[in-house]
């Protein structure tokens, strides 16, 4: 996962860590890859330091049920982040939030320091209009070497498809 990280991200993490600032990952990704990323970035407790979309897990089997509990995307990212802050006694106005996505504007509008990272033209214009900080974190190693790709997921109605 580190090969997909923009160079400026590591500098920001180091800066906030040296200042003694608690930082977390807030992503629309599902809980499992989000927690794996948190561990790679050295977060103390991946459970507490990750705000992500959550798929329901069957308590009995430990398997994913296919049901979505939480979506941390768009307005949903604001909602789950606000809940996390309320649970942890954190005021959103004391937070710095870095994003490269226009879908995160609602959360950007509620934090004290919104930062647009490598924004596209639309987010750049929006950030400029509001006087938000705009930064360039460079290009991730993986993106420098190969074109963008997307992921797909197939759901076969909960059945297991495989040999035999």
Functional labels for PLM-detected ranges:
Residues 1-164:
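C-terminal cap/substrate-recognition subdomain and adjoining C-terminal extension
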